[in-house]
Amino acid sequence: MRIEDIPHIPVLLNETIGLYNDMPENGYFIDCTLGFGGHSEAILEKYPNIKLIGIDQDAEAMHFAKNRLARFGDRVQFINKRASSALEELPEDLPVSGILADIGVSSYQLDNKERGFTFESEELDMRMDKTQDFSAKDVVNFYSKEDLERIIKNYGECRRFKKVVSAIISKRPIKSNRELADILGHIGLRDKKDLAKIFQAIRIEVNNELNELEKILKNAKKLAKNGTILGIITFHSLEDRIVKNTFKEWSKKCICPPEAIRCECGGNNQLGKILTKKPLVASKEEIKMNPRSRSAKLRGFQFIRG
């Protein structure tokens, strides 16, 4: 893909930029999932005193982002690795103004058959990080019946998980996404939404996505300073539930167990405030332009340090 062909409008752009209106304007903005750099570009344009740390495990996407953000010079630094690892390595005294994580597969990754995410791909791959050895081929062909049932049921939220797993195991070895889609079609899963949930489950397992999200939240909390705003964009209910529940816990003053007769924790455990009572979602206009934005949800939290 040429740099000119990169999609220039990232998901929930206006909503995301608006979320950071009250962040400190002279520190670092950490984009945990840089992708093609669309959100970061908008932040750098709006806040001339902000410096950016752009993180992404996808070297291909980062190559494009470097070109896109080259005009900002030394205001930008890039880290090509998993966000959880990169955040752990940043100094805790770093003046962090904002943190963003867009927890989703880009349209480029989904549409590029060579990346092995699409139903039509000739490879069972689904790796965000191409240097990683473990791929969808390992999950589909070598996981036990019990482990496959676990991920299809929990990550794919599929009621027919036993039938799906039986069909997969009976046709091993499976070599391509297209072959997998055909196998699922023969048991009645022909609808794209149904197929997408099965592929989603495998992709989550390959990239350890839910554990990665939890680590991002944990490390973001460590780095946050007074006024730091954290924004998380999710694309399915499993991720959104993790973010929603984490922000809810962080906003609690009292963390005593429900059975406690009186507060014994001091009642001063609140880390900040939730900025989005309900998640921000795409407008009708954005959904028309980008149907995949329909499932995107943005939640925000601002840390308050005494």
Swiss-Prot record:
Its main location: cytoplasm. Keywords: Cytoplasm, Methyltransferase, rRNA processing, S-adenosyl-L-methionine, Transferase. It is found in: Cytoplasm. One of its GO terms (biological process) is rRNA base methylation. One of its GO terms (molecular function) is rRNA (cytosine-N4-)-methyltransferase activity. Its EC number is 2.1.1.199. The keyword Protein transport does not apply. One of its GO terms (cellular component) is cytoplasm. The keyword Methyltransferase applies. It is an enzyme of class 2 (transferase). S-adenosyl-L-methionine binds at residues 37-39, 56, 102, 109. It catalyses: cytidine(1402) in 16S rRNA + S-adenosyl-L-methionine = N(4)-methylcytidine(1402) in 16S rRNA + S-adenosyl-L-homocysteine + H(+). InterPro entries: RsmH, SAM-dep_MeTrfase_MraW_recog, SAM-dependent_MTases_sf. Belongs to the methyltransferase superfamily. RsmH family. Specifically methylates the N4 position of cytidine in position 1402 (C1402) of 16S rRNA. This is Ribosomal RNA small subunit methyltransferase H. The gene is rsmH.
